[in-house]
């Protein structure tokens, strides 16, 4: 919560420092997530909130996870599939999906949360990490 990150690269570096010691990611994850974000941007301007959903190939995921970052100020990500201007993401949700193709289902569920004004307000209004997790679970 409230990470001081100005760029996607800083978000990814902070994520690596949290995930690697806990055994969630494999060696090479940081380079892989940066490379994938450059090639396939993940910023989404949703009706209820701006989000980014970066992820990498399952080979870099040691244990499945979903990491949620609420930066202290929005972090600008390029728009997914070239769909418009860069997106100042209020929430960054890093998907650590271990099975090929598993990202699609998770992406759809997360997008549904942030298309719903009440669900998005619930998630954005949380002030603790556990609160964020609980809010996402309520609407997932």
Task: Cite the ranges covered by each PLM segment.
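Cytosolic covalent-transfer regions centered on His/Cys nucleophiles
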Residues: 1-140
